């Protein structure tokens, strides 16, 4: 189920457009995640008290977390499925410390695609979107596999 060279070209090409403004992209991803799937916000003690979009937008912690999420994802994507060294500690923390269900990874991955499509409509056509979805599915599947290794059924 790996990606072809052409698919990786699409993924890394759009990621190069995302990277210069990870904080804005990441902030939007986190806010959208909380809007569309409010149950995910309950996983974050530091975000539980943020009740409005304005509060979420003005939170430096939301921006910081969004940047952290997309920075980690970018490192994994750039490794083109040779991501074991980056993925293992991420999966371990999400499985054993944070207890983030795989379902939530599905939610955030789809939101990442939507946010990129909104911010880069002319650069993120159907082929690029399909390639990104495939790369993110690979990431989720590998995270789920690691979760099981850590005894978390997530």
From Swiss-Prot:
The record's section on Pfam families has:
Globin (PF00042)
Positions binding nitrite in this chain are: 65
**Enzyme superclass (EC):** oxidoreductase
Q: Where is the Globin domain?
A: 2-148
EC assignment: the record states: 1.7.-.-, 1.11.1.-
Q: Which InterPro entries match?
A: Globin, Globin-like_sf, Myoglobin
State the oligomer form and interacting partners: Monomeric.
Protein name, per record:
Myoglobin
The species is Graptemys geographica (Common map turtle)
Its ancestry begins with: Eukaryota, Metazoa, Chordata, Craniata, Vertebrata
């Amino acid at each position: 189920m790996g990606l072809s060279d052409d698919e990786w070209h699409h993924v890394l090409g759009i990621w190069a457009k995302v990277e210069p403004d990870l904080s804005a992209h990441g902030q939007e991803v986190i806010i959208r995640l909380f809007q569309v799937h409010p149950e995910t916000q309950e996983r974050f003690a530091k975000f539980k008290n943020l009740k409005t979009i304005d509060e979420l937008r003005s939170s430096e912690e939301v921006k910081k977390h969004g940047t952290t999420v997309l920075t980690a994802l970018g490192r994994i994507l750039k490794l083109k499925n040779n991501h074991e060294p980056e993925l293992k500690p991420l999966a371990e923390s999400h499985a054993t410390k944070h207890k983030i269900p795989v379902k939530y990874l599905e939610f955030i991955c789809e939101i990442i695609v939507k946010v990129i499509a909104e911010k880069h409509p002319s650069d993120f056509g159907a082929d690029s979107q399909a390639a990104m979805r495939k790369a993110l599915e690979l990431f989720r599947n590998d995270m789920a596999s690691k979760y099981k290794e850590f005894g978390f059924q997530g």
